[in-house]
Amino acid sequence: MATPYISMAGIGKSFGPVHALKSVNLTVYPGEIHALLGENGAGKSTLMKVLSGIHEPTKGTITINNISYNKLDHKLAAQLGIGIIYQELSVIDELTVLENLYIGRHLTKKICGVNIIDWREMRVRAAMMLLRVGLKVDLDEKVANLSISHKQMLEIAKTLMLDAKVIIMDEPTSSLTNKEVDYLFLIMNQLRKEGTAIVYISHKLAEIRRICDRYTVMKDGSSVCSGIVSDVSNDDIVRLMVGRELQNRFNAMKENVSNLAHETVFEVRNVTSRDRKKVRDISFSVCRGEILGFAGLVGSGRTELMNCLFGVDKRAGGEIRLNGKDISPRSPLDAVKKGMAYITESRRDNGFFPNFSIAQNMAISRSLKDGGYKGAMGLFHEVDEQRTAENQRELLALKCHSVNQNITELSGGNQQKVLISKWLCCCPEVIIFDEPTRGIDVGAKAEIYKVMRQLADDGKVILMVSSELPEIITVCDRIAVFCEGRLTQILTNRDDMSEEEIMAWALPQE
C-alpha cells in the first residue's frame, strides 16, 4: 500500500483533569476518503483540531509526509497541506466570491517599487479553481446570494487554494438536499482521483458506505477500530461506536419508576418549528412524576424542540397542554408564568448571571414569575432572598462558603445546582434539563441525577436532553429518540433501552 500522508500515533489531549483524547491512532493515505466515526463526545472534533493545529496534543506523534511532529500550529498545519471545513461554514456573506477566496493573503506585484494587489492574477487563479470544483458563479457575486451547496463548494475551493493535500469535512451534508449531496460527492470523487485525501466526519451510514474507502471508529476519546468500509455492516459500525459498557458506567442508578399514578399532565401535539427543518410534527405526552429522556445526534432537533416548548423559538403550529389546558407559551416569560422551567445546555451563556451572587441568581426567576417584589429591580427583599437561598442550599446540598459569594467561584456541578434551585423557587410543574451534566465530574453527576429523581418523586414532569447515552438510559423512565427534526421512536421497555437500540433510531436510514 502507498505511504500514508498522515499518521497520528498515541494522540492524547487533556483539558485540565478531563481527558478528551486518550490514545488515538489514525492513518490517512493520499487519494482516499476516510470516514471518522463515533458518538457525540467521542473525540472526533478534538482530534481534527489537533491535526489542524488548533489544539496542542498532550502526548503522541503526528507524522505528515514522512516528517514527525510533537505538535502543530494552525499556520504550520496549513503549510503542510491540512485544510478543514467546519459544519458551520466560515465564508463571509458580506464579501464577494473573489474576496472570500483571498482573505488575508492577497497576491501582490511591484509597480515602481511599490507592492500593490494583483487583482488580475487573483481573478485568473480564482476562475481556474472554481472550474476545478465545478462552481459556476460570478467572482464578483456576494456570497450571501449563494446557496448552501455553492458556499460549500467555495469552502472547498478556498482550501484547495492553499494547496491542501488533506481536507477535513465535518458533517458536510447536514444542510444539503439530495441533489446537492450528489454534486458534492461528484467533486469529492474528482479530488480523490487527483490524489487529495479527505477525512469525512458523518453519522449518516448510507453516505459513509457510498463515498468512503476506509473508516476509523472512536469511542470515549480512543480509536477502537479501523478498516475497509465494504468489510463491515452498519450494525457492526453501530456496535463499535457504542461499545459494550452500558448502564453500569455511572454509580448513580435510576431506581424504579415513580410510584405516582400514571396521570398524563403534559402533552405536546403536532408541534412544528417555523424553520421546518429543525422540528416537524412532534407529539408526545408525559405523566406526573416521570422523567422523559430525549436522545439523538447533534442537530437532530432536541434542543430546538425545547426552545419551541419554552417559547424561545416561534412555532409554525401545534399545541402544548398542561393539566388539560392549552398553555402554548408565547415567550420564555410566558412559559415561566404558566409553570415551566428551562435549565439550558449553556450555563454561562444562558443560565446564570456571572456578576451576581448565589442568592441573587436564585432569586431571579421567582421575581420574573411573580411580577417583581418590593425590592429594587423587582427582586426579593434581601431578607427573603437570603432565607430562600439558605433553604435551597440545604435542600440541594450546595457546597459553598456563603450564599453571598459570586456564582463563578463554584464548581460546575454546584453552579448547576444553583440553576436548578433558581427554577425551584418558581414552583414549576414542568422542568426541562438540557445537557444537565455537561462539563461536570462523575460525583457531581450522581448528585444531579439524585436531584432530578427527587423532583420527579415530588410530582414534577422532567424533560431531559442528553447526548450521553449511558446517562439517559440510567436516569430516564422512557426515551424519545430524534433524527433530523423528527421523533422516530419512544422506547418504553427497559430491555429496549440499549445504546445500540437508541443509535439504530437516531441514525438516518437513507
Swiss-Prot record:
**What does this protein do, in the record's words?**
Part of the ABC transporter complex AlsBAC involved in D-allose import. Probably responsible for energy coupling to the transport system.
Q: Which organism is it from?
A: Escherichia coli (strain K12)
Q: What is its EC number?
A: 7.5.2.8
GO biological process terms held by the UniProt record: D-allose transmembrane transport; D-ribose transmembrane transport
The membrane topology of this protein is: Peripheral membrane protein
**Domain ABC transporter span(s) in chain numbering:** 6-245, 260-509
Q: How does it assemble?
A: The complex is composed of two ATP-binding proteins (AlsA), two transmembrane proteins (AlsC) and a solute-binding protein (AlsB).
Q: What class of enzyme is it?
A: translocase
Instruction: Extract one GO molecular function annotation from the record.
Output: ATP binding
Q: Name the keywords, alphabetized.
A: ATP-binding, Cell inner membrane, Cell membrane, Membrane, Nucleotide-binding, Repeat, Sugar transport, Translocase, Transport
Gene, per the UniProt record: alsA
Keyword Transcription among record annotations: no
Residues binding ATP: 38-45
Q: Which domain of life is it from?
A: Bacteria
How is this protein annotated for GO cellular component? ATP-binding cassette (ABC) transporter complex, substrate-binding subunit-containing; membrane; plasma membrane
Question: By its UniProt entry, which Pfam families does this protein fall under?
Answer: ABC_tran
Which family is annotated? Belongs to the ABC transporter superfamily. D-allose importer (TC 3.A.1.2.6) family.
Where it sits in the cell: the answer is: Cell inner membrane
Q: What is this protein called?
A: D-allose import ATP-binding protein AlsA
Report if keyword Membrane is assigned.
Answer: yes
**What reaction(s) does this enzyme catalyze?**
D-allose(out) + ATP + H2O = D-allose(in) + ADP + phosphate + H(+)
